[in-house]
């Protein structure tokens, strides 16, 4: 059974489907953080057009965030999962085995990320919201000029939309 996580954001809602069998540790971390309200009121601190939107850092700096396992945890990279297009859900990191709470959604194919970032899901619905996020005005550090944030993230129960 796939796990879905729904996000209500300042720009609309989207839902992601987690690849539990491909990246079990990453998916457990992500779903547990969402369930605990960890992602609520967290901004999208980095948005790069035609590349990706990134969030998951409660400090909003791009340098914070921790996992349910303590500080950082190892990659779950699979050769059969690639950043082939828009809507890929992947962990942000600062090098091998440095996963915490930050994640991104691709806006286009990003093959240079293959083998470097754990892919653990995809956008199931609301991709237009993600695409609109990718068009917001940003400053020189790729930070949105007007705040874009997650209002609420939650695990979708079976049978619920």
From Swiss-Prot:
Described function: PPIases accelerate the folding of proteins. It catalyzes the cis-trans isomerization of proline imidic peptide bonds in oligopeptides.
InterPro entries on file: Cyclophilin-like_dom_sf, Cyclophilin-type_PPIase, Cyclophilin-type_PPIase_CS, Cyclophilin-type_PPIase_dom, Cyclophilin_A-like
Membrane spanning residue stretches: none
GO terms for biological process, alphabetical: protein folding
GO molecular function (one): peptidyl-prolyl cis-trans isomerase activity
Keyword entries, A-Z: Isomerase, Rotamase
Reaction catalyzed: [protein]-peptidylproline (omega=180) = [protein]-peptidylproline (omega=0)
E.C. numbers: 5.2.1.8
Top-rank taxon: Eukaryota
Pfam families: Pro_isomerase
Gene3D superfamilies: Cyclophilin-like
GO cellular component: catalytic step 2 spliceosome
Domain spans labelled PPIase cyclophilin-type: 1-155
Designated name of the protein: Peptidyl-prolyl cis-trans isomerase-like 1
Matching SUPFAM superfamilies: Cyclophilin-like
Gene name of the encoded protein: cyp1
Similarity annotation: Belongs to the cyclophilin-type PPIase family. PPIL1 subfamily.
């Amino acid at each position: 059974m796939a796990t879905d996580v729904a996000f209500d954001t300042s720009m609309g809602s989207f839902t992601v489907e987690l690849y539990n069998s491909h990246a079990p540790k990453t998916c457990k971390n992500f779903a547990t953080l969402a369930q605990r309200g960890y992602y609520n009121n967290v901004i999208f601190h980095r948005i790069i057009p035609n590349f990706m939107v990134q969030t998951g850092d409660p400090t909003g700096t791009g340098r914070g965030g921790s996992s349910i396992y303590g500080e950082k945890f190892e990659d779950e990279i699979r050769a059969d999962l690639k950043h082939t297009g828009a809507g890929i859900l992947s962990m942000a990191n600062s090098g091998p085995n440095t996963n915490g709470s930050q994640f991104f959604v691709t806006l286009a194919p990003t093959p240079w990320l293959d083998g470097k970032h754990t892919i653990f899901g995809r956008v199931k619905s609301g991709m237009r919201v993600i695409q609109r996020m990718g068009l917001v005005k940003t400053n020189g550090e790729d930070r949105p000029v007007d705040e874009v944030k997650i209002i609420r993230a939650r695990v979708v129960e079976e049978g619920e939309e």
